[in-house]
Amino acid sequence: LVASHFSVMSKKTAQILTAGPAVVARAMGEEKTKEELGGWKVHTKNGTVDNGADDEAACLTEIQRFLSFMPDSVEQLAPVTKCDDPVDRADEQLASIVPKDRRKAFDMRRVISLVLDQESFFEMGAGYGRSQITGLGRLSGQPVGVWANNCKFLAGSMTTDGAHKARRFIELCETFSLPIVSLVDEPGFMIGSQAEREATIRHGTSAVLTAAMTTVPWASVMVRRSFGVAQAAHYGPEGFVLAWPSAESGPLPVEGGVAVAFQREIAAAADPETRRRELEEQLAARQSPFPRAEALGVHDLIDPRRTREELCRWVGRIQPLLPALLGTAKFSIRP
């Protein structure tokens, strides 16, 4: 189960345990039920299993849905289905879904649903590594892996759990030759004492290096933030990169960069708070997508409403590349 590419637990009947209640009580002095020790709430939160379902019939439906995106083996391509959703569908919600206030969150899952073929998104691991969203979907009928930041949880930063979740998902896509679509709103590695104790840097770097080792096509859309070392995990080798006007990128978010680089200048100012805001505004202008687009750092700066159309065109362009990816799996199964 734990070594599977996808796993699902029944909420009513399933538990996963290394030792049952009697053994735990005798050895550890803990009085716990099987559900408390290893029920679906425990294991969908800690990442042991991907999804939970109401009963066994619902579990089979989840498995069937997962397999609908998968090829029969690594020697075959994933099945492309007929798509009645217009390639050039441009949803007006995308034009205003990212708030003008950089500190406000938005619904990345809504972005995903508006860009992919309608009702095609199948999320995996929603309860684990919650700052990252991973799942399978379709663009013009072509199965793709979808990875995005969830700014509603820890601002979408890359935590230890999030990095582990992303790494496993990238490896899944690489193994089965699924193109990857990354919707980027990455503020960087999670900071703070707990993040340091959890070795976020090490686990985050593992995700970055896994992305760098892939051979499948990538399309990355800079929706908003793209900062720090963590951002590198969102861009595959020779990937196709699009940017929205709301995109901002750099080594550090403005607030952190100003606080570190201009600490003395701010402290010496007659009005430190005013000076801090002035510096943040100056640097924010440099982190906009326009200088990067002018320097050919992205393939195109687009109206967000064109995202689906551009990604569907990309899917069409990469079709000749996919057969060459078939064969021996590049990654073993790493839980």
Feature locations, PLM:
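Ligand-binding clefts of soluble mixed alpha/beta catalytic domains
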Residues: 2-335
